[in-house]
Amino acid sequence: TAKIRGWDYFKEGDIYFVNDSYFTGTHLNDITIFAPIFWKHKLVGFSASRAHWLDVGGKDPGGSMDSTNIYQEGFRWPTTKLYENNKPNKEIIEFLKINGRFGYSLEGDMNAQIAAGKTGEKRFKSIIDRFGLDLIHAARDEIFKQSEELERQAVKDIKDGEYYAEGFLDDDGLGSDPI
């Protein structure tokens, strides 16, 4: 989202959701809700959660194993503001509720994810207050450094060349041929 819209798109008090499979890499029932975290008016991170919603308006509640295209799975949303300046976007929320079979459940799932995000924000800010942003950045950088070193160790003995692999699923739910 930042790549597409820029970092200035994120504002204090805003909460976003997205379920676009081509963006998130999961099916449409997996909803990501996230919010920027600001500390002293500076963007310092994000809180996020992903949850499987029972129904997002697809042909079958819970997901469709026999769908042949994405439009049968339900509504597909790019990153969209659920809240702006700490106020819910009632039109978007109502649209979500009326396009699913279980609007009350959808709203409950959404509110649970928002509460989880607010808890994450509160705890992250308490860590910043306790240790300071410089130490948190140093710890993050050290984690990245150690991860890179371990990755390089893992591949250093692999000889140069071309490698390939094949994989199969049992079937696609529409037939019995391996895919």
Describe the role of every protein-language-model region.
Residues 1-4, 37, 57:
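Feature captures the catalytic cores and cofactor-binding loops of soluble hydro-lyases/lyases
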Residues 1-24, 128-179:
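Gly/Pro-rich turn-and-neighbor structural signature
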Residues 7-10, 26-28, 39-40, 69, ...:
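Solvent-exposed alpha-helices and their adjacent loops that cap or buttress functional pockets
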Residues 24-30, 56-57:
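Short, Lys/Arg- and Gly-enriched loop/turn segments at beta-strand edges
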Residues 30-40, 48:
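A short, hydrophobic, proline-anchored segment that marks a local hinge/packing element in signaling
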Residues 43:
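Glycine-rich acetyl-CoA-binding "A-motif" of GNAT/NAT acetyltransferases
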